[in-house]
Design a protein with these regions (language model features):
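Acidic metal-coordinating catalytic centers involved in nucleic-acid phosphodiester chemistry
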Residues: 1-12, 62-129
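Catalytic centers of nucleases
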Residues: 5, 12-13, 17-79
Length: 129
């Protein structure tokens, strides 16, 4: 057999490699008392001395554009809000994706707006659907 199968192990290996690179980058920036964990509560967790300084990173490797209705964004939020996940242990949820923002995506300003504006943006997207 020549070529790659749809479920090639290479894709899984590359995804984990990407997680390790993101985690390694965070390792170089660790402060006293902080730790990095892989696949603890999600893809990469930075646990600090208090919950507000801890962060949970979901690392995604997608080639299509990140649009307002993209499953990647909404599935990440859904998982974070599951009753069995204790999001109170983390001050931040970061979606670290290889996706470019879609041209008409209202999410494209996500990284420059505050928490209240993000919540309002989510409400607006939900009200359109």
């Amino acid at each position: 057999m020549c070529g790659k199968t749809k479920n090639s192990a290479l894709i899984t290996a590359l995804a984990f490699h990407y997680q390790v690179l993101v985690g390694l980058d965070k390792c170089f920036k660790l402060k006293e008392g902080e730790s990095i964990f892989f696949e603890k509560d999600g893809d990469v967790s930075l646990v600090g001395q208090n919950d507000s300084s801890s962060l949970q990173m979901e690392i995604k490797n997608y080639s299509d554009s990140l649009t307002d209705n993209h499953l990647n964004f909404w599935k990440t939020l859904k998982n974070w809000l599951q009753p069995e996940f204790n999001q109170a242990k983390y001050g931040y949820l970061i979606l670290h994706t290889t996706q470019p923002f879609g041209v008409s995506s209202t999410l494209k300003n996500w990284n420059t707006i505050d928490i209240e504006e993000r919540l309002e943006l989510i409400r607006k997207i939900c009200s359109k659907n």
